[in-house]
Amino acid sequence: VPSTIELRDAVPDDLDEICSLIRELAEYERMLDDVVLAPAVMAGHLFGPDPSARVTMAEDGGTVAGFALWFPTFSTFLGRPGIWLEDLFVRPEHRGRGIGQALIRSLRARTDGRVEWNVLDWNQPSIDFYGSLGARPLPGWITYRWTPDESAPG
């Protein structure tokens, strides 16, 4: 990783930049219409007294180049905590400099458990990138989602 790359934990002053990065990621993933985040609510979840998630910021020469938004998980089979990587994004003009790799490594350094994430099945550049790091898809697993605006069974 070039010496101009710096990783750091996000602070409340990063909120606008985090929201911009999320929108840029959503645009890249062709899901911009799905983004309904409210910055004030997001601030509470990231920087409140009991944060739901954390953000690692990546700067390249003092400019925000990307981020990883993640939160702790727990594996009952391993009997230890891990990390779920919700979002990883490096701005196009900063790609190819080792920033994504540095962000992933920073998460692996935070846990001796699993680091897990999803990737869209059409996103071959990301699939290739994750494969180059030694990560592999989980055969036999399907991701499910229940959203609060859908009726719950029973």
Where do the model's predicted regions map?
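A short beta-loop-alpha structural element at the N-terminal edge
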Residues: 6-18
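A short helix-loop-beta-strand connector motif used in the catalytic cores of GNAT acetyltransferases and
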Residues: 44-57, 84
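Conserved acetyl-CoA pyrophosphate-binding loop and the N-cap/start of the following alpha-helix
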Residues: 94-106
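A conserved beta-turn-beta hairpin within the catalytic core of GNAT-like acetyltransferases
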Residues: 73-85, 95, 113, 138-139
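Conserved GNAT-fold acetyl-CoA-binding loop/helix
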Residues: 19-44
